[in-house]
C-alpha cells in the first residue's frame, strides 16, 4: 500500500503531536503509512498524487473564514499552497479527508460559505448520517446516529450545489460532506 499524506498546520508541538497520534490511532495506520508534513514550518513541496493513497488535513489555529487582511503571512502561504493542491485533488477525484480546518479549507475552495454561524464549543453532539452518508463508503460500519467530539470556531453554513451532506447535527447542520 502507498502511504497517506497528513498535512498539518499546528505550530505548537504538543497539540500537533497529539493530533498526529490521534490520526494514527483512529486510522490504524503507522508512521510509515501516514506521513506527516507540517505546513506551518515549511512550504508544501510538489506532491505527485500517484505516490499517495490519499491526503488528510487536520485542525489548525487558522480559520478559513478569517478576513484576508487579518491572516498572517504563514496562513496566506499555507492556504495558497493547499488551494493549488486541492485544484488537482478535486480534478482527479483523489481521496481526501478533511477534519476541522481541512473541512473549512476544502469547503472554501469549492465555494461554500464558512463562517461562525454554526460554531460549536468543545462537546460531543449526536451526528446523524443522511441517506447519502449511509450509502457512502467513508461511513461504512458507522451507525446512523453517533457521537463525535467537536470544537469548531467556524463551520459550513452553505455548501455549493455539487456537494453532498453526509452527516448533520442539531447545532451544526453540516458535520460531514463530500464533493
Language-model features: locations:
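A short, Lys/Arg-enriched amphipathic alpha-helix followed by its capping loop at the start of a domain
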Residues: 22-32
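Gly/Ala-rich beta-loop-alpha elbow adjacent to hydrolase catalytic centers
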Residues: 98, 102, 107
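Extreme N-terminal starter segment of soluble prokaryotic enzymes
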Residues: 1-6
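Glycine/Thr-rich phosphate-binding loops of Rossmann-like dinucleotide-binding domains
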Residues: 14, 64-66, 107
Amino acid at each position: 500500500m502507498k502511504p497517506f499524506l497528513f498535512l498539518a498546520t499546528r505550530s505548537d508541538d504538543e497539540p500537533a503531536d497529539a493530533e498526529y497520534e490521534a490520526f494514527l490511532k483512529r486510522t490504524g495506520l503507522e508512521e510509515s503509512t501516514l506521513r506527516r508534513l507540517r505546513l506551518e514550518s515549511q512550504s508544501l513541496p510538489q506532491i505527485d498524487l500517484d505516490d499517495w493513497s490519499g491526503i488528510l488535513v487536520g485542525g489548525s489555529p487558522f480559520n478559513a473564514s478569517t478576513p484576508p487582511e487579518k491572516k498572517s503571512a504563514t496562513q496566506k502561504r499555507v492556504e495558497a499552497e493547499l488551494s493549488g493542491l486541492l485544484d488537482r485533488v478535486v480534478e482527479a477525484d483523489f481521496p481526501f479527508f478533511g477534519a476541522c480546518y481541512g473541512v473549512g479549507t476544502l469547503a472554501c475552495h469549492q465555494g461554500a460559505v464558512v463562517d461562525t454561524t454554526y460554531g460549536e464549543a468543545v462537546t460531543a453532539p449526536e451526528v446523524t448520517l443522511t441517506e447519502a452518508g449511509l450509502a457512502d463508503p467513508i461511513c461504512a460500519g458507522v451507525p446512523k446516529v453517533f457521537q463525535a467530539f467537536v470544537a469548531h470556531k467556524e463551520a459550513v453554513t452553505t455548501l455549493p450545489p455539487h456537494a453532498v451532506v453526509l452527516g448533520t447535527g442539531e447545532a451544526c447542520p453540516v458535520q460531514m460532506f463530500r464533493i
